Amino acid sequence: MQGNLEVLEGLARRLDISVPVDQLETEVQSRLKRLARSVKMHGFRPGKAPLSAVARQHGAGVRQEVLGETLKTRFGEAVQTHQLRIAGYPRFEPKADASAAAEMTFSASFEVYPEVKIDALDSATLNRPVVELGDADVAKTLEVLQKQRRTFATAARAAAEGDLVKFDYQGTVDGAPFEGGRGEDFAAVIGEGRLLKDFEQALVGLKAGDSKGFDLTFPAEYAARELADKTAHFEVQVKEVQAPVLPPVDAEFAEALGVEDGDVEKLKAEVKSNLEREVKRRVQAKLKEQAMELLLQKSTLDLPRSLVEMEMDRLRRMTEADMQSRGVQSMKLSADMFTGQAERRVRLGLILAEIVQANKLAAQPEQIRSLIQDQAQSYEEPDQVVQWYYQSPERMQEIESLALEENVVAWVADQATVVDVATSFDELMGRA
């Protein structure tokens, strides 16, 4: 009966596994004897408890341990015999109709990995963005850096987008004040999103000394649930308007950004180099997105339910941990919330694994090192970042996964037609 394979619906399989009782009991007795030499039991010195007492207290646990290990071993042997690729973990159940008292018989239920069929990709097209970086792109980036280091100076004019406004406010709902609805000397920059958009727009055009009343409806998803969808009336009194002052792009500015000799041209060259690196990453991301969608469309496979459920649970735990880290009140999420995402991830994972294996696309050491060095270039101490990656097997696994994805994208690009599409930097970054 050992290893009798039953093909069930879809990817489900069942194996009958038998365990000789005499072998099981022999191993149980051997372990109990070893345990008796060191176990501490009430009323006996360490290692002096009689075997019968040790068996009464620990026999059930030891027997379960031995049975579990034996089932795992014999299941592995049967899997090798039938050349099966197991997805997830088997579920063992005792068979009530065991034919011989000399044997314990179990059925192992499990799923196998599916066959992955991928249609030809030669009729498909991938659009590859092509970006020509110019002086204007460098200038825009420098302006962003200037704004990050801006100061503010009092302005004797009406408030506009980008100005810092200092004001007092009082809000009411149905004529009654509410928590957080009153403030003095509150300061906010118009357009930064610290306030609701309608509140910010109400400040535009006001000068120091001006007062204004206006109504505002809180959005349905507002964090303070008691205010969601409600209309409040606000009275504001502007105390000061300050206009932004950008630092000049000079030697002092360059030094503040890490250019030791303050050479502005070196700063511009460094900015352009960073932009080129970002363009490369974004282009690769765009190609990857298209390649993955194409593979999902062109592939046919059954999904092992066990893998989907494992991924659903993993996503649930990750989301709960992320919520807790951001101070969101702890709550138990349903794994069913992640069904679609989990199915997509499992499907893609199986497709990619098939392509990597069938086309020998394993990541090479030099490719992994190149990816690590590319990641490290974004930091002030790249050599330390490289060491940080190599010191962690988990981080190295992440980089290897990135390398495999790159290899699959390159393989898809070779199979399909790649069309270069002229794209501005802002379009690539989603800012156009």
Swiss-Prot record:
Q: Name one GO molecular function term.
A: protein folding chaperone
InterPro entries given in the database record: PPIase_dom_sf (IPR046357), PPIase_FKBP_dom (IPR001179), Trig_fac (IPR005215), Trigger_fac_C (IPR008880), Trigger_fac_C_sf (IPR037041), Trigger_fac_ribosome-bd_bac (IPR008881), Trigger_fac_ribosome-bd_sf (IPR036611), Trigger_fact/SurA_dom_sf (IPR027304)
Record has Cell division as a keyword = yes
In its keyword annotation, does this UniProt entry include Secreted?
Answer: no
State the EC number(s): 5.2.1.8
* Major location (coarse): cytoplasm
Alphabetized, the UniProt keywords read: Cell cycle, Cell division, Chaperone, Cytoplasm, Isomerase, Rotamase
Q: Which family does this protein fall into?
A: Belongs to the FKBP-type PPIase family. Tig subfamily.
Write out the function statement from the record.
Involved in protein export. Acts as a chaperone by maintaining the newly synthesized protein in an open conformation. Functions as a peptidyl-prolyl cis-trans isomerase.
Domain-related comment? Consists of 3 domains; the N-terminus binds the ribosome, the middle domain has PPIase activity, while the C-terminus has intrinsic chaperone activity on its own.
Could you tell me what this protein is called? Trigger factor
Native organism is: Thiobacillus denitrificans (strain ATCC 25259 / T1)
